């Protein structure tokens, strides 16, 4: 028999379902995604570690790869997954995972709350996977995401020491990141393979997206980049949530770009300039040609204008 608490929570989830995933402040919001055209591509990057990515030029919010990247650690101890993609491509993801290993999917950890990384959670929970994530992520889902209660994390953790799992000859570290891309970010480090999945606080396409509505912050994003450079070695393979793999040295110009824009915006705020005036000044001009997608129209989710507006608002609020 279900407990009163379980029934109550289920009722709350049903009520907020009308808000749906679309209420989350995410890239590509309001744009139609042709889910039927998304193919799942598999890349083996270590003896038992694989990356699954959606096909390029399909998802308007992520032309560099539809949906969020998935990590798959396979072996005799079962399967450990990182992120779950869109709900609508769940069967395709399952098929790709089964081609790697037919064993049980035991654990799934979310890097952050956005539905291109979490909407498929329920698909894998119903296959027996235990979902792990930051406590802030679970709280955010209960507030806004709605949908199937099975998609909620059942094991949560906060800031502090990394949570470690040992399976398939690998040590997996779940490293909590202070409010960066969102308020509940986690990096996943595969120690023996020398691989770190960094989620979306680093991006290859367009300017940084700091989702303030879901707890992200400019200061936290910079701290996350610093932490990544600290724990990554010279040969560590860094895997963003979308796009190409990078190394530690690739973070330096990305971080410098953020600091450069931040300094310029701060200077203009000190001069009494309004947000409109700051946007008109095109403070990202020195970087636009170097940032893939940096010259896209202002309405695009990866645009310079959205980034500059966020920087302005964060600095005005003293964050």
Where in this protein do the model-derived segments appear?
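Bacterial N-terminal signal peptides that target proteins for export
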Residues: 1-13, 22
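Accessory terminal helices/loops
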Residues: 16-19, 23-32, 230, 244-319
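Short N-terminal segments immediately surrounding and downstream of signal-peptide cleavage
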Residues: 26-47
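Conserved beta-strand hairpin/beta-sheet module of binuclear metal-dependent hydrolase folds
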Residues: 44-97, 186-190, 194-198
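Divalent metal-coordination and catalytic microenvironments
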Residues: 48, 73, 83, 97, ...
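Acidic/histidine-rich helix-loop elements
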Residues: 52-68, 141-147, 205-215
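Metallo-beta-lactamase
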Residues: 78-80, 86-88, 164, 171, ...
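Active-site HxH/HxHxD metal-binding segment of metal-dependent hydrolases
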Residues: 95-166, 183
